[in-house]
């Protein structure tokens, strides 16, 4: 199971969940086919799997790769650390969704739309957990 997921950095909740695709599809191709739109002026932190995917009106932050046979400048290393510190929040969000084993294990159900429903339930449970985690009792 694979789909695109947009999460909020402030509340660590799933904001957008794309339709489920087969797991073998590349991340960039998945985003190109979906045509996900973002609000103007949004910041997008992504990994190198989305290299070449352009989103109009969005500030894209992507880590720099070390040049072949060379070294990465100290400024780029510092930028990569900053991007990684933001992206780790989203990686933890994805791990929170994958606590539901139906999402991360081999999915053998062939009923139409059941894979989307399972992913929606997993994201809903994650949002429920994070909502109560950040509330004052």
Region spans (language model):
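Short, well-ordered secondary-structure "scaffold" segments embedded in the functional core
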Residues: 1-137
